[in-house]
Amino acid sequence: MIYDVIIVGAGASGLFLGANLKGKKVAILEKNSSAGKKILASGGGRCNITNRFVSAKNYLGEQKFIEQILKILSPDQVLKFFSELKFSEQKQNQFFCDSGAKSVLGLLLKRQNADIFYNKEVLGAKKVDEIFEILTKDEKFRTRNLVIASGGLSYKALGASDVGYKIASEFGIELSPTTPALVV
């Protein structure tokens, strides 16, 4: 089978994308036995979902690109997606889920438009003609479009790995040096 889109990583970004890709055959490959481990840990288990004031200057990278992304997906649009959950605005205009991070993860899973494959650690990827081939320990997946949403290097105990960096390097994508960050 050839998927329209394969997403590597069932964290916040991968699950959010999978829930919003409609009308396509989508798969998510997750190396852990369950999705969203970092979601469950975020905000002390209360999941700080977004901030009221989000600006490109708060991010490292190409400012114009970041500005375009923030225009496409604003904090209000994120809150609208999660509108069936109740959020409280707290210190520094942060939004926390009143019913906890498990509710956020549950909603992301409920709204999935993707087949999620657990225990599928990605070992590498290559492009053959116009098709990406994604290799796991026991299976090969094929797709027309590949999204790397494997997260950063923090919280190795929750499944963090450098697979996204390796795949990006294999495809000649220039990477910025990683730096520690604190979300405020």
Where are the regions that the model predicts?
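N-terminal Rossmann-like FAD-binding beta1-loop-alpha1 element of flavoenzymes
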Residues: 3-28
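Redox-cofactor binding/interface segments in oxidoreductases and associated redox assembly factors
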Residues: 8, 41, 148-149
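Short beta->alpha hinge that forms the Motif I/post-I loop of the SAM-binding pocket
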Residues: 31
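Predominantly flavin-linked oxidoreductase catalytic cores and closely associated redox partners
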Residues: 34, 111-184
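A short alpha-helix-loop-beta-strand transition element characteristic
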Residues: 35-41, 69-74, 85-95, 172-182
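Glycine-rich active-site loop/strand segments that organize a redox cofactor
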Residues: 44-91
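Short beta-strand to alpha-helix junction loop
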Residues: 66-74, 91-110, 117, 155-163, ...
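Residue-level signal for inorganic ion chemistry
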Residues: 82, 108, 168
